[in-house]
């Protein structure tokens, strides 16, 4: 039986990953939106500019779709394979940091969906790292 901290961390990870799927789905919808963006707040915050830029696609696949699939994969790993989840969350965080740099330095505009996803994946990484450490300690104490 798993300890309550492990169960709590698993629940938090699943909730965060589901939030990531939702935010990525909104960005995915924005990628194909031809109407004015609902999150075009001002000249510094505009999801339309970000999601229609050439940086929003990797090998003809929208980055938002990668996010949907990635968060779904991470959710499926929560509580089952903590070390693998932490490794994949780190890879996702590195990819996200690259996209954050693109928003900041190249596009010079921010997307609220993207920033939300950045916060979510950073939190997922930290919690999954903690879960992996606790899992390893539990195995060692057996």
Residue map of PLM features:
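Membrane-interfacial helix-loop segments of redox and metal-homeostasis proteins
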Residues: 1-142
């Amino acid at each position: 039986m798993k300890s309550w901290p492990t169960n709590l961390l698993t629940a938090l990870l699943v909730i965060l990953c589901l939030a990531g799927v939702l935010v990525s789905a909104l960005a995915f919808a924005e990628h194909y939106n031809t109407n004015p963006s609902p999150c075009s707040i001002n000249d510094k915050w505009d999801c339309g500019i970000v999601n229609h830029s050439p940086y929003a696609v990797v090998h003809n696949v929208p980055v938002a779709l990668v996010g949907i699939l990635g968060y779904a994969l991470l959710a499926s790993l929560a509580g089952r394979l903590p070390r693998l989840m932490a490794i994949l969350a780190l890879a996702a965080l590195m990819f996200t940091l690259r996209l954050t740099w693109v928003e900041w330095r190249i596009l010079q505009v921010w997307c609220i969906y993207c920033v939300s996803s950045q916060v979510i994946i950073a939190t997922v990484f930290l919690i999954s790292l903690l879960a992996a450490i606790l899992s390893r300690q539990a195995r060692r104490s057996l």
